[in-house]
A protein has these predicted regions:
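C-terminal, active-site-flanking charged/polar segments
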Residues: 5, 15-17, 71-83, 88-94, ...
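Detector for the c-type heme attachment site
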Residues: 10-17, 43-44, 49-57, 74, ...
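Sequence/structural segment immediately N-terminal to covalent heme-attachment motifs in c-type
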Residues: 30-54, 130, 148-151
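Long, ordered, helix-rich scaffold segments
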Residues: 31-35, 41, 70-74, 99-100, ...
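Long, low-complexity, intrinsically disordered segments
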Residues: 171-182
Length: 182
């Protein structure tokens, strides 16, 4: 939600002692080894399972949906994105967002690693900072419509607002415990 994103933004502003949100244009090289390694990490991580890309819907059901990645460059500081990717749970405990798997140098040195991980990731030799830089740069380059409120509303108007119930759900209980606990 916007509230969650604004909480994350305020957190990063706080740790950076930043009072203003304006930042100059972030430049990256979309032909670099880091960028292409980030693209591969993105592909392997299946970010599109949960995240929107402009008006492109996630591949999983609505209960797993996460923010529109086309908003990354509009809302966030590039360094914040790296820290978020490094350990989302440290910043927002309980978030569904997993940290991306970053293969270490031993994994990338194995026979067949280039086939599994791609040439660019192998070239980085397990450098996690370079991998996170590349993933951040790739996310920064995602294009698409940023305000998709009407698209999402239309989806729910057509498909309803119900999320699938668990088989073990009881009458009057949601997936977070008894309603009276709230």
């Amino acid at each position: 939600t916007d509230k969650d994103w604004n909480t994350i933004i305020r957190y990063f502003q706080y740790i950076d002692s930043e009072k203003i949100s304006y930042r100059g244009e972030f430049a990256f090289d979309n032909n670099s080894t880091e960028y292409h390694a980030g693209e591969k990490l993105h592909e392997l991580g299946a970010c599109n399972n949960c995240h929107f890309y402009g008006e492109e819907f996630p591949t999983q059901e609505a209960s797993t949906w996460a923010p529109n990645l086309a908003l990354t460059k509009e809302r966030l500081n590039p360094e914040w994105v790296k820290e978020w990717l490094r350990d989302p749970q440290a910043i927002m405990p309980g978030t569904k967002m997993p940290a991306p798997y970053l293969p270490d140098k031993d994994i990338l040195a194995m026979d067949g690693a280039e086939d599994d991980w791609g040439e660019e990731l192998v070239k980085l030799g397990g450098d996690s900072t370079a991998m996170l830089n590349g993933l951040r740069d790739y996310l920064w380059d995602i294009k698409g419509k940023t305000n998709i409120d009407a698209t999402i509303k239309e989806y729910f108007d057509e498909n309803g607002y119900e999320f699938g119930a668990e088989e073990d759900d009881f009458e009057g209980e949601d997936d977070w415990g008894d309603d009276e606990d709230w």
